[in-house]
Amino acid sequence: MTRAALGPLLLALALRPAAGQLVAVGPQFVLADYREVASGLRYRGNGFGGTLWARRNRFSVEAAVVRLSFDPVAGSAADSGFTATQVDAWVAYDVAAYASIEVGVLHRSVDPEFDAQSVGAVRVGARSFYQIGPGATVVFRANYLAAPKFSGGGHAAVSLDLGLGLDVRLAGRLHGTATYAFNRMNRRTNPGGTGEIDAPIQETVARLGLALGF
């Protein structure tokens, strides 16, 4: 098969309606804002990533990976940037036609290691989804981030991740996706053993992408 023939064939497969669609995968462009509130550190960044979603009966899995480059904003106490790789994953079970309960993980690694906080946490929460029009679905997610671990130490009794998403079927198997997530970890540290102080961390992540269903 020639390259000239292969291109139209792949396009036709992408645009053909999918019966019983179970898997979707695609690229994402990402914008992010990261703050360590007490120390006056604030960064903005962007990058690229990918997402995978799969469903079988009432169960579904979702994963997203992104690589971000951050730079300090005006007025930040930071004088240099860093890169971060973030992995988000969920396993969900539908309890109703419009709602699921879910568990998962959040993992963010940072380079250079101590320019910002690397974080790992377990997700426990729920999501709801509503069809707002033909081929268009809006999703709201709320997760408690349990047992977070920080590269710089400390603990956080209250950590939340909230998300809003939109999925629009553009043509057949091809979807457009947009998500916005906000998480805040009310971290506390005890530097030098002199007593605990507040050191909260918050991050916002906006993703815009395409997904191809199979």
What are these regions (language model features)?
Residues 27, 50-56, 89-93, 105, ...:
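Residues on the lipid-exposed face of transmembrane beta-strands in outer-membrane beta-barrel proteins
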Residues 18-75, 205-214:
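Short glycine/proline- and aromatic-enriched beta-strand/turn motifs that initiate or cap beta-hairpins
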Residues 42-48, 55, 81-87, 97, ...:
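Residues that define the transmembrane beta-barrel architecture of outer-membrane proteins
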Residues 35-43, 71-82, 111-119, 149-160, ...:
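Outer-membrane beta-barrel translocator domains and adjoining extracellular loop/strand segments
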Residues 29-35, 56-58, 65-71, 105-111, ...:
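Transmembrane beta-strands of outer-membrane beta-barrel pores
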Residues 1-24:
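Cleavable N-terminal export/targeting peptides
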Residues 156-214:
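Predominantly the C-terminal beta-signal and adjacent terminal strand-loop region
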Residues 23-24, 57-63, 97-101, 133-138, ...:
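Repeated loop/turn-to-beta-strand initiation elements of outer-membrane beta-barrel proteins
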